[in-house]
A protein has these predicted regions:
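Short, intrinsically disordered, charge-biased short linear motifs at domain edges
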Residues: 1-6
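ATP-binding/phosphotransfer module of carbohydrate and carboxylate kinases, centering on a glycine-rich
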Residues: 7-12, 17-157
Length: 157
């Protein structure tokens, strides 16, 4: 989340740096992207009816699944950013899969389809079409506990 992806004009992050992936590919990041895009959008969109300070990712998701072009574009842009970050990550770790968890991952193909397409556009040809993009089936709050347990298991082997 705190890998810098925008060195020039990055959004300020709570960690104290600017341009962190988390400020673009998270629940908060999606809202910020939507707020930025609404300001210059001249077409019809449900997002214009929502006060900027009350807009949520769920609002954007609901608009997208109901065909709102701007909301769909927000998820596409977020997915593209995520796909580029995954391509960079895969260059030095070559994972078999990326497993996404949490509120934003619940957007499913709205997010993951453009992420995978962009990943395949930017990844080394050696890795193209090899990594899977999966949505976790774990319950909220379970991933951190299982991850910590797995680390403990590996340390004690």
């Amino acid at each position: 989340g705190h890998t810098i992806i925008d060195y020039e004009n990055g959004r300020p992050c709570g960690c104290g740096r600017k341009g962190c992936l988390d400020m673009y590919c998270s629940i908060r990041g999606v809202v910020l992207t939507a707020q930025e895009m609404v300001n210059g959008y001249y077409g019809e969109t449900k997002l214009k009816d929502i006060e900027a300070n009350t807009m949520t990712t769920l609002d954007i998701y609901n608009a997208a699944v109901n065909g709102d072009e701007l909301a769909i574009e927000v998820f596409r842009k977020t997915g593209e950013t995520l796909g580029k970050a995954c391509a960079n990550f895969a260059t030095f770790l070559s994972p078999e899969a990326f497993i996404f968890f949490g509120g934003l991952a619940k957007a499913g193909d709205l997010l993951l389809k453009p992420a995978k397409e962009t990943y395949n556009k930017y990844i080394l040809s050696l890795y193209k079409d090899k990594a899977k993009f999966l949505q976790s089936g774990l319950e909220d709050g379970t991933a951190a506990i299982l991850g910590a347990a797995a680390v403990g298991w590996e340390i004690n082997k």
